[in-house]
Amino acid sequence: MPLRIAAAVAVVAFSGVSSDAYAENWPQWRGPSANGISPETNLPVTWSTTENIAWKLPLPAWSGSTPIVWGDRIFLNVSENGGIHLWAIDRAKGEPLWKRHLSDGDTKMRKQNMSTPSPVTDGTGVWVMTGTGILKAFDFNGKELWARDIQKEYGPFGLNWGYGSSPMLFGDSLFVQVLHGMKTDDPSYVLRISKANGRTIWRVERPTIAQRESPDSYTTPAIVRHGKSLELVITGGDAVTGHDVNTGKELWRADSLNPTNDFAYRIVASPVVHGELIIAPSRERPMLAMRPGGRGDVANSHIVWSFQNGPDVPTPVTDGTYVYVINDRGIMWCLDAKTGKEVYGKMRLRPSTYSGSFALADGKLYITNEDGLTTVLRAGPTFEILAENNFDDYTLSSPAVSDGQIFIRTASALWAIGKPRSK
């Protein structure tokens, strides 16, 4: 199945939006198929602050939130003047079209300033969550459609480093997870919310055996198709769980992400789905490959392979043939997706801290470190660096790819890389 349809097929069936429309855009944090892959071709390989740049838009602050792109619009979560705001940007000009206030409060916690969750869009509406628990919907002209305060409704978030999960947009619904425990005794839970009116379709608690900081999860959910059914995949609290998307009921579970019962095993890297392959990272080890369709405890039945070098923060990417993994220290592996065996391993990229995640497109891997240097690698079984492109600016977010351009958000600017579009 072509990459652009690998996960988007289910979205199309669910929502009526064409797969081509999803493919050419970057509608949520992990792109058109929610797995970091884009079918785009002829993408830039080399650039600098002065070369191969369509435009540069100054920004007021750093953020872990990734830009999302649909057609002629780009949307950003922005921390500014003590609050969190949604910016809509003209893609051709690189200028703000409108700004909307989301929430007061931009508490700074290392790599968190309450703007971390990335927005999502279906080309008609845009939905955005903040680290303060505000969830809002807007149309493309900036009209607010509805708003909710998740903390007010269900209690304060209790994560050690603040709430950072992005909503998952799938068909007519948003899936929002709140997995916490370090600073609260309240249960973790998952919500399915109507994108049209903001009403809760279901809410289910998600139990955990994890202790202290280990219940905390900063991941974003994923959807996997198994036969004719759809399963929502959640990682965190030492476990991988699969849920019925229609009811939220937990179908299966593997309490296998923290075998040593470490008390500080929060999870940041999100689950990744390609076809019926689920990649479930943990903080350090293990990283699991699983198959869906199980019932009950699947730790001994549905784990395909286990890899003992986890990414910690960056989310892996897989094209179904290879799984590419990089940890927060810039050490990279390529694994056989079917067996988990190393194709190559412990290859070191430029020394730095890596908080962003891979984008895989045009036969290339793009990864940006916290110093603003993007390494471009050839995808495939051979480790080959094609280029290193440096913006020399603090960077936490991941590259976004759309219609021949790459968008990278640094602390001081949003950069559009590639040929300018007609204005």
What annotation goes with each model-predicted range?
Residues 20-423:
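Noncatalytic, solvent-exposed loop/strand surfaces
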Residues 6-17:
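Bacterial N-terminal signal peptides
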Residues 1-2:
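N-terminal secretory signal peptides that target proteins for export/translocation
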